Amino acid sequence: MITSKTQLVGLFGHPVSHSQSPMMHNTAFLETGLGFAYAAFDVEPENLEDAVAGIRALGLKGINVTIPHKVAIMPMLDEIDPLAKRIGAVNTVVSRDGRLIGYNTDGMGYVRSLVEETGIVLEKQVVTMVGAGGAARAVAFTLAEQGVKEIRIINRSRERAAVLAEHVGMIVPTKIVEQGEGEAAIADSSLLINTTSIGMLPNVQETPVPAEWLHSGLTVSDLIYNPLETRLLKEARAIGATVHSGIGMFVNQGALAFELWTGEQAPTGVMREVVLQQLKKTT
């Protein structure tokens, strides 16, 4: 029950009606008995500055930030965590001692779920990544900081891939996969990651990589979690590759935000279960 002592957190985005975050976080708050409540706020871009002022005025403990505000919100905050600065986007804001601090939990949420669910040793990985957008930046920078051997980027826009390769290349060897070189790049990779929306509902017959490029020595990871098993993952499983779906990243990025706001460990099992139940209802 919400009382006068309830600590409020929430989500700023546009639109937000599809979000699983309120259900996931409120279930976690109930499970832990913490006096927090989570709401989704549909904030149009022209109202973002007022909404950020509202965090201060209303005493919110923090917020999640989603599309289209992850970059636009950065100059409105008092401090940006170094990893979020490198990624160039914020997905979590914490209000601490009157200051608003921006973090990005997407990359660490991804890495935490990948390691927990597959047992993968990151230091041994040669990574091929499909995509060079915001999700790709978060994942690439975090994997680089965790010490993977090499990152290869496949992307429709070479220009965007070049920018990401240049920045990540300051930490770990990174190269662009040129047109026609995708199959060869994946052939001697150990981890393949789809960071694009190719294969997401309703376009479930699409896949970012032809099945014949996959091999059993791969761990194939897809950031999409709706559907829970994309065509890419089905085809990878069929040839004996290890597969990893996007639900773990979604749950763990939320769990890390929960921990930043509350200082308590998040009940990730409960959070995962409620999201799974919700997805099964809607698919």
From Swiss-Prot:
Segments traversing the membrane: none
GO biological process terms held by the UniProt record: amino acid biosynthetic process; aromatic amino acid family biosynthetic process; chorismate biosynthetic process; shikimate metabolic process
Entry keyword NADP: yes
Keyword terms, alphabetized: Amino-acid biosynthesis, Aromatic amino acid biosynthesis, NADP, Oxidoreductase
SUPFAM superfamilies, per database record: Aminoacid dehydrogenase-like, N-terminal domain, NAD(P)-binding Rossmann-fold domains
Active site: 70 (proton acceptor)
CDD domains named in the record: NAD_bind_Shikimate_DH
A matching Pfam family: Shikimate_DH
Residues reported to bind NADP(+): 131-135, 223, 246
UniProt name for this protein: Shikimate dehydrogenase (NADP(+))
Annotated source species: Brevibacillus brevis (strain 47 / JCM 6285 / NBRC 100599)
